[in-house]
Amino acid sequence: MTEVPRSGSGLPRRAGEIAAAVLGVTLIGCALAATERWCDRHFLPSFFLPRRGYVLILIVVRVAMAALGVWLAFVARPRVGRLVARTPARAVHIAIAGVLAIGASEAVLRSMRLRPAEWLMPDEEPRRQPDAQLGWTFVPARAGHADVGGRAIEYAFDSAGYRVRRVDEPVDPDRPTILCIGESVMFGEGLTWEESVPAQLGGMMGIQSANLAVHGYSTDQEYLRLQAELPHFRRPVAVVSLFMTALFGRNLDDDRPHLGPGLRWLPPQSHARLASLAKLLVPYRRSETVERGVAMTREVLRAIADRSRERGATPLIVVPQLGREEAGERIVRRRVLDEAQLPYVLVEIDDAWRLPWDRHPNARAAHVIAAAITARLHSAADARGQTAPVSSMRQKGPPR
């Protein structure tokens, strides 16, 4: 006896097949569209993952998407249709369970106290504390210790929160001073105070340096930090700001205090926790977001130079390039700096000159960076204080 199909089973079956086919074709289309050029446009250079890592991940994901798409569209489509036709209620239950799981995950994450992506570990040395204007700063007047590459590193801070040799040797704001702003590279992550760029720069120039850098800062946070601290110094000689193309993505984040058009201060933006987690794992950027980041970064770097000149200090942007400059990094550098006619010194560093088990520059690399800055500042002084023209200095080894 032939089994008579249940009334209405044909429509759910066709709907299931169509859904599987559409999803499969979509996955195949995405796999074809996700080229290296697309990747370079929407995934910015990363300090922690070289481009070749991104490309390898992209290849694996494209192959997986294409294979899954073909399987859904041409192999599993009839099975999906039959499954939906036999148990349409189960498909609805699965969809409801998925929605409830997402909602529950979001609720759990919202119950946790989360920090911006650049400050996830509260007990990490050097210790940070919340700051309503800047997002976070270092805890002042203390010394902390960390083991980096098998070395015990001391991070000491004076009462102003600047990194110093010893807590009882604070920066003197009345002396001629070179102010250094930036993030962990300028700060000297994994380096002793003597090995850090600001300390070596001060020694080469014979002028006191002030290390105002803070871990995880973006370019606009650097500017806000300078804006708050520059008035405290009576005789600023130079302001050296660090810009790394591999860290440009930070300038696009808004989960911290940030600057909008016209350098307008904006509070942190709250996002869905799951969306923030997905963005951390898959840092996709829309083209419009990148364009806004380029414009904001140019405006901030100009403002840093203007504030420095107003106080009689020479502004200089240092651009350390660890390893060979990839095409994506070159595009960011040219768009942010060259097209805006901003003065900077490009310092190419051997990719091997990094800390063990860490991607931060080692003491040898810090020496090269400090030497390049010193040469440019001497050149500016010889020009009677006039700003040096836009160009780059490629230096691959310590000066002899």
Spell out what each predicted region is.
Residues 1-14, 79-89:
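Membrane-interfacial, low-structure loops and terminal tails that flank and connect transmembrane helices
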Residues 13, 18, 25-51, 55, ...:
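Serine-dependent acyl-ester chemistry module
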Residues 60-95:
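Cytosolic-side transmembrane helix boundary signature
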Residues 92-116:
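Transmembrane alpha-helices and immediately adjacent membrane-cytoplasm interface residues
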Residues 112-207, 350-354:
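Membrane/wall-proximal cationic-aromatic binding patches
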Residues 183, 222, 238-239, 308, ...:
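Generic structural signal for small/hydrophobic residues in well-ordered secondary structure
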Residues 219, 223, 294, 298, ...:
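Short, amphipathic alpha-helical "lid/cap" segments that border enzyme active or binding sites
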